[in-house]
From Swiss-Prot:
Pathway: Amino-acid degradation; L-phenylalanine degradation; acetoacetate and fumarate from L-phenylalanine: step 4/6
EC number: 1.13.11.5
Cofactor: Fe cation
UniProt-recorded name of the protein: Homogentisate 1,2-dioxygenase
Family classification: Belongs to the homogentisate dioxygenase family.
Length: 448
């Protein structure tokens, strides 16, 4: 199949509601780009069809419980051992990994404006700017948050991350992620997740692109438990899309970059590694449209905890304490009676990195801009600014629909340490704390 053509659903078992994708979360998928490329009833035939090589990609130990066991079988033109060659260290640029102690910054609530799009040519790897790190990449715990600024597609360059899975959150411009498993296209208000070890390249679709990137060192993202919410709402499994098989058979010099142990390595290949003709399994990249998230909330009074907006969670070994929660604040109705409707003032055991894809965030109508970010680390107080407080305290409590907005949060159990880049960036707002300065003493013991 020509990788430059739109991927199609071809062959045995490739069922999906959208051309090019298969619907579902964590399914055991199967797809082939050439008829008969996928063996039936076995994984490793003596001679695979079309002269392909059978290769397993494992995302969990062999003995992981069945519900947590992740692997896929790939039928490819060349095995990955043919891809490795000799690796040499490459320049990491502004990409950092935990633990990153390069800058000792005083604790504070922090907020950044959106970075400007650079004029120079920057591919994905050159355009990553790490904002915070948490945990330890070598113990497979924690995360890193990054911004990406891309002005040039990767050409004859590919990458995979052995340290963690990557979640792309576009804010400006669309991306085409050409992966071993197939092609994923995403735009602002969509996300994509690329598991550890999956080779891919990043291409621009409609000009320069800016967005956020979460690097998850810990357990793979999964859907949160709904508890008493029941069987529906929040992020529904059917809205997650995994690409059908698409491959290229190109014998051209290609650079392969690997992030491993917090460092970047590279080698040169004589061919493209995007050569998987068929695959089956439950370890694969996927995309999700955040606009399909079905929010739930208070329909009587009070403001519920933000955990009800969790799209995906990376669990830790402690039940209910996430390695990462990915939370969004989408369009929704505000109807609670006799209630302060914005998020309340808070001190939290978790550390919160927030971004804004579009619109206005209801707790911060000023200063928190699309493409910007904020960091509220563990046990540092935060909450609505003066303007939001006054409006919510005195406004008419009629039903109001928040429209045209999409904020998100990467929340982790670990403290998030700020990188030197983030601490010295010209986009760092030195007056962020002033947004609370106008909150005056209102206490009057004579007026209950």
């Amino acid at each position: 199949m020509n990788i430059n053509a739109a991927p199609q659903i071809i062959g045995h078992g490739s069922q999906g509601v959208t051309p090019g994708y298969m619907s579902g979360f964590g399914n055991s998928f199967e797809t082939e780009a050439l008829p008969g490329a996928l063996p039936i009833g076995r994984n490793s035939p003596q001679r695979a069809a079309y002269g392909l090589y059978a290769e397993q990609l494992s995302g969990s130990p062999f003995t992981a419980p069945r519900g947590a066991n992740e692997r896929s079988w790939l039928y490819r033109i060349r095995p990955s051992v043919k891809h490795s060659g000799r690796f040499t260290k490459a320049d990491m640029g502004l990409w950092r990994s935990a633990p990153c102690l390069e800058y000792d910054m005083p604790i504070a609530q922090l907020r950044w404006d959106a970075p400007s799009m650079p004029q120079e040519d920057l591919t994905f790897l050159q355009g990553v700017r790490t904002m915070t790190t948490a945990g330890d990449v070598n113990t497979q715990a924690g995360m890193a948050t990054h911004m990406y600024l891309i002005t040039q597609s990767m050409v004859d360059q590919h990458f995979y991350n052995a340290d963690g899975e990557l979640m792309f959150v576009p804010q400006q411009g669309s991306l085409r992620l050409v992966t071993e498993f197939g092609v994923i296209s995403i735009e602002p208000a969509e996300i994509a997740v690329i598991p550890r070890g999956v080779k891919f390249r990043v291409e621009l679709v409609d000009g320069p692109a800016r967005g956020y990137l979460c690097e998850n060192y810990g357990g793979a993202f999964t859907l949160p438990e709904r508890g008493p919410i029941g069987a529906n709402c929040l992020a529904n499994s059917r809205d997650f899309l995994t690409p059908v098989a698409a491959y290229e058979d190109r014998d051209v010099p290609t650079e392969l970059f690997v992030k491993w142990g917090g460092a970047l390595w590279q080698t040169t290949l004589p061919h493209s590694p995007i050569d998987v003709v068929a695959w089956h399994g439950n370890y694969a990249p996927y995309k999700y449209d955040l606009r399909t998230f079905s929010p739930v909330g208070a329909i009587g009074f009070d403001h519920p905890d933000p955990s009800i907006f969790t799209v995906l969670t990376s669990p830790s070994e402690t039940a209910g304490t996430a390695n990462i929660d990915f939370v969004i604040f989408p369009e929704r109705w505000m109807v609670a009676e006799n209630t302060f409707r914005p998020p309340w003032y808070h001190m939290n055991i978790m550390s919160e990195f927030m971004g804004l894809i579009c619109g206005v965030y209801d707790a911060k109508p000023q200063g928190f801009v699309p493409g910007g970010a904020s960091l509220h680390n563990m046990m540092l107080p935060h909450g609505p600014d003066r303007e939001a407080f006054d409006h919510a305290s005195n406004g008419e409590l009629k039903p109001v629909k928040l429209t045209g907005t999409m904020a998100f949060m990467f929340e982790t159990r670990y403290p998030q340490r700020v990188t030197e880049y983030a601490a010295t960036a010209g986009t760092l707002q030195d007056d962020y704390a002033d947004c609370w300065r106008g909150l005056e003493k209102r206490f009057d013991p004579s007026r209950p």
